[in-house]
Swiss-Prot record:
Protein name: GTP cyclohydrolase 1
GO annotation (BP), single: one-carbon metabolic process
SUPFAM superfamilies recorded: Tetrahydrobiopterin biosynthesis enzymes-like
Entry EC no(s): 3.5.4.16
Signal peptide bounds: none
Gene3D superfamilies: 1.10.286.10, 3.30.1130.10
Source taxon at top rank: Bacteria
Pfam families, sorted: GTP_cyclohydroI
Reaction(s) this enzyme catalyzes, per UniProt: GTP + H2O = 7,8-dihydroneopterin 3'-triphosphate + formate + H(+)
Matching PANTHER family: GTP CYCLOHYDROLASE 1, GTP CYCLOHYDROLASE I
Organism per entry: Haemophilus ducreyi (strain 35000HP / ATCC 700724)
Residues that, per the record, bind Zn(2+): C109, H112, C180
HAMAP family: FolE
């Protein structure tokens, strides 16, 4: 049975309470069983497309897809993979904005299972706790590693950091290209989607919000 950290449990419960958790069902199979079953189904899908899986280039594709789905691009569906977060007491009394910009976003659109590619900015005003800067990137990556819609993703990482840091003073900005728009349908290769979410002082104070937006647009 997977062990889920207390931080992961708190974040998950906060998302459920707000109604912004990714729609999921309870998993009853272990990873090996899920990989094996996905591999079998992907073999059927590829054959229905007319691909010859006896070809050297294709014969391992069902296995590669199953492993990629479970262990990599959808690993964020399993809270046992939530990054280990150690909050540090804010003994230096840091009171200025902490901003991490240009965090790489690579996720998967839950409507068509194609790529979402973009950048994320995360800012917060420390109160009692601070966290290591790399942990911010890791939390963003965790929520990217699941089928997503950008609006929900933005709200999820806002709530996650508010929960971990025990402060409402968090701001999120996401700018991304959606390959469901770029490579199919309208096939618009130039457009991008921007979403943002603000809490606490970022929501209540226009000047604070303006400072954040000015910093990320420099």
């Amino acid at each position: 049975m997977s062990i889920i950290s207390s931080e992961a449990q708190k974040v998950r419960q906060a998302l459920i309470k707000k109604g912004i958790e990714t729609p999921t069902i309870e998993l009853t199979q272990d990873k090996d069983s899920r990989r094996a079953e996905i591999q079998q189904h992907m073999r059927s899908v590829l054959e229905l497309l007319g691909l010859d899986l006896r070809d050297d280039s294709l014969e391992e594709t069902p296995h590669r897809l199953a492993k990629m789905y479970v262990d990599e691009i959808f690993s964020g569906l399993d809270y046992a993979t939530f990054p280990k977060i150690t909050t540090i007491e804010n003994r230096m009394k840091v009171s200025e904005m902490v901003l991490v910009d240009d965090i790489t976003l690579t996720s998967t659109c839950e409507h068509h299972f194609v790529t979402i590619d973009g950048k994320v900015a995360v800012a917060y005003y420390p109160k009692k706790w601070v966290i290591g800067l790399s942990k911010i990137n890791r939390v963003v990556q965790f929520f990217a590693q699941r089928p997503q819609v950008q609006e929900r993703f933005t709200e999820q990482i806002l709530t996650a950091f508010q929960t971990i840091l025990e402060t409402e003073d968090v701001a999120i900005y996401v700018k991304a290209t959606h390959f469901c728009v770029k490579c199919r349908g309208i096939k618009d290769s130039n457009s991008y989607t921007v979403t943002s979410a603000f809490g606490g002082v970022f929501l209540d104070d226009r000047e604070t919000r303006k400072e954040f937006l000015n910093l990320i647009h420099k």
